[in-house]
Regions:
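Short alpha-helical transmembrane interface motifs in multi-pass membrane proteins
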Residues: 1, 37-39, 72-78, 102-106, ...
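Small-residue-rich hydrophobic transmembrane alpha-helices
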Residues: 1-47, 85-103
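Hydrophobic alpha-helical elements at and bordering transmembrane segments
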Residues: 28, 32, 71, 75, ...
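Residue-level recognition of transmembrane alpha-helices
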Residues: 39, 75-78, 82, 100, ...
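Membrane-embedded alpha-helical segments of multi-pass transporters/permeases
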Residues: 44-55, 60, 77, 116, ...
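Alpha-helical transmembrane segments of multi-pass membrane proteins
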Residues: 49, 65-91
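Membrane-interface helix-loop junctions in multi-pass transport and translocation proteins
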Residues: 112-146
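Interhelical loop/hinge segments that connect adjacent transmembrane helices in multipass membrane
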Residues: 137, 149-183
Length: 183
């Protein structure tokens, strides 16, 4: 489901790169908050619609009752990672647009390590089976999101003084954001 919203990363990186090239620190700041905000809004919608999304998936894909039960367990745990994952798409695109591809790489490596360690621990030490794998994934998603926030706060905190909340959701700017991401 998440990669449907990959435009958050791709469009954000292009627009941020343009603002970076123009040395427009205000627009750079707005783009981060806009992309993360849109990601969090979409995640909220996914959380609200999780039941019909899962039912639609099982309508489209025929499975055995056992697979459906396991997939349901996994889905209902992992869906709570939507805010972290979609928010991280915004951060990753923004970091790349800021000519910093190392931070997304560090975050991805950290997420993978956390996911492996947590999933193995939950499955083999706590015998949580598929719920353990899902919980490990969920923890890794939030570890990546919080790492992105910490990296932003540590290395880009000077941009926080440029935040003007009403400019983030300007109608014309939001239209441009979605227009770029649509194409």
């Amino acid at each position: 489901i998440y990669w449907i919203f990959g435009f958050l990363r791709m469009g954000t990186s292009g627009m941020t790169s343009q603002a970076y090239g123009q040395h427009d620190l205000n627009e750079i700041t707005r783009l981060l908050l806009r992309s993360v905000g849109v990601g969090l809004f979409i995640a909220l919608c996914l959380l609200i619609l999780q039941y019909p999304i899962l039912k639609l998936a099982f309508t489209l894909i025929q499975t055995t009752p056992e697979v459906e039960q396991l997939a349901t367990t996994y889905f209902y745990i992992c869906i709570w990672g939507a805010p972290a994952t979609l928010g991280l798409y915004g951060f990753a695109g923004w970091f790349i647009g800021m000519q910093n591809s190392r931070f997304p790489m560090y975050i991805a490596i950290t997420q993978n390590i956390v996911n492996i360690v947590a999933s193995l621990s939950f499955v083999y030490l706590l015998d949580m089976k598929v719920a353990g794998v899902a919980t490990g994934t969920l923890i890794a998603q939030y570890a990546g999101f919080f790492m992105a926030i910490l990296l932003y706060m540590r290395y880009y905190s000077a941009l926080r003084k440029r935040i003007v909340w009403k400019e983030i959701i300007q109608k014309q700017a939001m239209y441009r954001f979605f227009q770029v991401n649509r194409d």
